Amino acid sequence: MKLLFSRNPNPRLAVATARYLKADVTFEFASPMAPGAAETYRVLNPNLTLPILVGEGWSLWEADAIACRLSRAIGSDFWRSDDDEPDMIRWISWGKERFAYACDMVHFERGTKQRYGLGSIDQKLVEEGFRQFHRAAAVLEPELSGREWLVGTAISYADFRMATFLPFNDAAGLPLDDYPSIRRWYDRLEAIDAWRDPFRGLQAPQLPPVKAEA
């Protein structure tokens, strides 16, 4: 299998997952939106987004689906398949709609738009993102106060998914330190090599720098 990726948040998540699982995949940097590249990638993913997992005669897109397939391929409980599976899916779903969504809202304004010249920062959207971040963090904080991971006693894909945008917090500036249980949980993730530096040894051009607004 081959994993097509970039350094953006969701492809990063897929690479971190594959490397954490030590999955039997090769990694290939891709740029579906590069001039002349669209038709090559459209047959693999009509959305022209990454990540994409490619096998013989098939392709699979979306980071969550890729995590499920890779986990099942090696028999890992990183993607739960027992009684914990509904709980894991609950946190994946809630995270994408609440916590990670809020992180993305702020990161898009302060990070993505400034990297790619997509316009000035919309401070109202930043403020709304912070409001939603605090609301979601107020739910997540007590959940993590008495345990190390979101599901059961071991790490799961729900932890990776919840933290999708936190590696980019140097640009977003979300106040993790206001929530000590979340901070400790994320520090545990950062102690995992595959999460902290998923691109080590891979050919993967750096993201454009975040440009400060004049």
What are these regions (language model features)?
Residues 65, 181, 194:
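Residue-level recognition of oxygen-bearing side chains
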Residues 31-34, 158, 203-204:
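Conserved beta-strand edge residues that scaffold enzyme active sites
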Residues 95-191:
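GST-like fold's C-terminal all-alpha helical module
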Residues 195-214:
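Terminal-tail/helix-coil boundary detector
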Residues 1-123:
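GST-like domain detector, emphasizing the conserved glutathione-binding G-site
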Residues 71, 165-166, 199:
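Active-site-flanking alpha-helical
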